[in-house]
Amino acid sequence: MIETCLCWVGGIFIVTCIAYVVYVALEVHVFPGRSLTTYGANPKLRGAGSWALVTGATDGIGREFAMQLAARGFNIVAVSRTAEKLAILSKEIESTMPGIKTCYYAMDFLSAGNAEYEGLEQLIRHLDIAVLVNNVGLSHTMPVNFLEMDGRELASICQVNIVATMQVTRVVAPHLVRRGRGLILNLGSFSGQWSTPLLATYAGSKAFLIAWTQALGEEMRRSHVDVQLLNTYFVVSSMSKVRKPSMMVPTPKNFVRSALSRIGRSSGALGRPFTLTPFPSHAWLDWAVEHFVPRWWLLRQAYDVSLDTRRRAIRKAQRLEKSQ
């Protein structure tokens, strides 16, 4: 009798595990995300759709968000530091996607104060903003022990990754609430989820975004504004310093395509509210590490990787110094 019960329990456990893995696979690869027409995109009649505001819009992931949201029928508000790059982006969008309207706002998030945020508010006050992509971010120049970190770099990372993100959201979110439907995407990082020694300040700023996004998401849910943190591993970009794409390191174009097709899902972030790990290989890594890898071991491995990265960065800097 006992043996029969144990067999049943074991069988139920195995079937449950298999069913769970199948569900994860469906979540990562099959189940569609929410259509962007929910938020006012109009791909058939360009220019008639609502607006999407993207920060850090002139390079990498931010640029791809601006381009792909425009391709899906949103007009674009591009916000970044360099006016010349913004003008080039705006011209490219309007020339390659006739009918789409753009405007841009040059803003240095490191030094922005009340006047700059008020200027942004004035720019968008009469626009039907439906989507906000908080993409702008800053990391360390190289991995560094926290006690050896330059105080100015510490302040800069917190200013851009935390303060600027909240300030832009404070300006834009009321537009989403008033229209009765909207979307806020915050660019997160695996570093915030699992932490990364020698990148402690960056990791801490991204961990803040996890908690803040979840709290904001629950608040905004009642106003029919969807809020999601896009959990991100390495992507080819100047910030990651990775130049060659691979199965685990997508190009910005492929990453953004995955993100925009999975809105409203969790993918590899199952069970974590208001969080989406959109790129398939990242999603499986997220799920596997969360379920099978001890945090203490992960921290030690991350420390070793960061230390090796720091040593290589120092050697590169020394070679450049000698060549000058």
UniProtKB/Swiss-Prot annotation:
CC terms in the record's Gene Ontology section: endoplasmic reticulum membrane
Subcellular location: Endoplasmic reticulum membrane
Membrane topology: Single-pass membrane protein
Regions that span the bilayer: 2-22
Keyword entries, A-Z: Endoplasmic reticulum, Fatty acid biosynthesis, Fatty acid metabolism, Lipid biosynthesis, Lipid metabolism, Membrane, NADP, Oxidoreductase, Transmembrane, Transmembrane helix
Name used for this protein in its record: Very-long-chain 3-oxoacyl-CoA reductase
Highest taxon listed in the record's lineage: Eukaryota
The keyword Endoplasmic reticulum belongs to this UniProt entry's keyword annotation: yes
GO terms for MF: ketoreductase activity; very-long-chain 3-oxoacyl-CoA reductase activity
Lineage of source species: Eukaryota, Fungi, Dikarya, Basidiomycota, Ustilaginomycotina
